[in-house]
């Protein structure tokens, strides 16, 4: 599974050099390609193709007829999904349409999150980390107590 955060830069042609650690996981456990899609104006998601197929099936099974918010989210992920393959230098070309929709440009953080990768603008990632570290630990403990999660 994917883990860790890597500060990277998108080059002038829109290419991202994916760390060897992530490429190795993909080639050992999956195929050497990813599906990239837009989750929000703050980040792109990258899934191994096999994991994306599971997510896409779940998205297609969502009951969205009476829920415009869920329908828009479903459409956002499904309509923007594209398969990317590495070049010989281990880079992927991020589609121009997706780059245009996110509010980051060159300085990014590629984060491993279990079965996927997340591409954040560096400023947004830092703000997210500051917020997470500033959250009230008692409130977090209470919220975690309402779940089945055991750390």
UniProtKB/Swiss-Prot annotation:
Compartmental location: Cytoplasm, Nucleoid
Q: Name one GO molecular function term.
A: DNA-binding transcription factor activity
GO biological processes: negative regulation of DNA-templated transcription initiation
The taxonomic lineage of its organism, from the top, reads: Bacteria, Pseudomonadati, Pseudomonadota, Betaproteobacteria, Neisseriales
Keyword hit for Cell wall biogenesis/degradation = no
Q: Which CDD domains match?
A: MraZ_C, MraZ_N
Family matches, as SUPFAM superfamilies: AbrB/MazE/MraZ-like
* Name of the molecule in the record: Transcriptional regulator MraZ
Q: Which UniProt keywords apply?
A: Cytoplasm, DNA-binding, Repeat, Transcription, Transcription regulation
Subunit structure, per the record?
Answer: Forms oligomers.
Q: Write out the transmembrane intervals.
A: none
